[in-house]
């Protein structure tokens, strides 16, 4: 349900939550600072986007899209689940190199290529019927306290939508790992 996405901070967010939902640059680099980072591709397929995703991509729900779902882990624990989509063009993804990324984070390409432009962040609390909530649940994460962000990247007019969902355990880890830093200041 696309109407749940907003470019404004959600009510009741902590300073940490607001920061992580709207921080520019590579999420992967920030996660690596918290511990041993790994990425697990859970699915990579051609499928149809959900209505809100299709709207953000500027296509219809019956237009095939290349979809990649991953779990971003710190110390082998799922902290973020992510879903990337790009429309198919003439039986190829609009961003063809993405199909070969395997277990590599997309950030190395997205932030090192000058002709790629990122749009504004949107955030939401995913509901049970949201693809991010379903992905989190499939990874064994409780779906009740999820926070997500998404943004659209453009290259040569071709969109790539990336949605990232922070699971409940992420915020606990962040508190645990940042507490010594706060005490030292």
Swiss-Prot record:
It is found in: Cytoplasm. It is an enzyme of class 4 (lyase). GO terms for biological process: pyruvate biosynthetic process; ubiquinone biosynthetic process. InterPro entries: Chorismate--pyruvate_lyase, Chorismate_lyase_/UTRA_dom_sf. GO terms for cellular component: cytosol. The keyword Lyase applies. Keywords: Cytoplasm, Lyase, Pyruvate, Ubiquinone biosynthesis. Signal peptide: none annotated. Substrate binds at residues 68, 106, 164. Transmembrane segments: none annotated. The keyword NAD does not apply. Pathway: Cofactor biosynthesis; ubiquinone biosynthesis. It catalyses: chorismate = 4-hydroxybenzoate + pyruvate. One of its GO terms (molecular function) is chorismate lyase activity. Its EC number is 4.1.3.40. Its main location: cytoplasm. Removes the pyruvyl group from chorismate, with concomitant aromatization of the ring, to provide 4-hydroxybenzoate (4HB) for the ubiquinone pathway. Belongs to the UbiC family. This is Probable chorismate pyruvate-lyase 1. The gene is ubiC1.
């Amino acid at each position: 349900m696309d109407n749940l996405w907003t470019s404004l901070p959600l009510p009741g967010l902590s300073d940490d939550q607001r920061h992580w939902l709207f921080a520019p640059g590579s999420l992967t680099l920030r996660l690596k600072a918290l511990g041993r980072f790994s990425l697990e591709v859970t699915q990579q397929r051609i499928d149809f986007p959900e209505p809100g995703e299709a709207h953000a991509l500027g296509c219809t729900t019956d237009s095939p899209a290349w979809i990649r779902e991953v779990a971003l882990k710190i110390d082998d624990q799922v902290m973020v689940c992510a879903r990337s989509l790009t429309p198919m063009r003439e039986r190829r993804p609009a961003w063809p190199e993405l199909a070969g990324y395997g277990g590599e984070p997309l950030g190395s390409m997205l932030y090192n290529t000058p002709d790629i432009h990122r749009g504004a962040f949107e955030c939401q609390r995913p509901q049970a019927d949201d693809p991010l909530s379903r992905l989190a649940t499939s990874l064994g994460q409780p779906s009740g306290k999820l926070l997500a962000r998404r943004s659209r990247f453009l290259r040569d007019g071709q969109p790539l939508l990336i949605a990232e969902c922070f699971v409940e355990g992420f915020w606990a880890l962040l508190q645990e790992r940042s507490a010594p830093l706060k005490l030292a200041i």
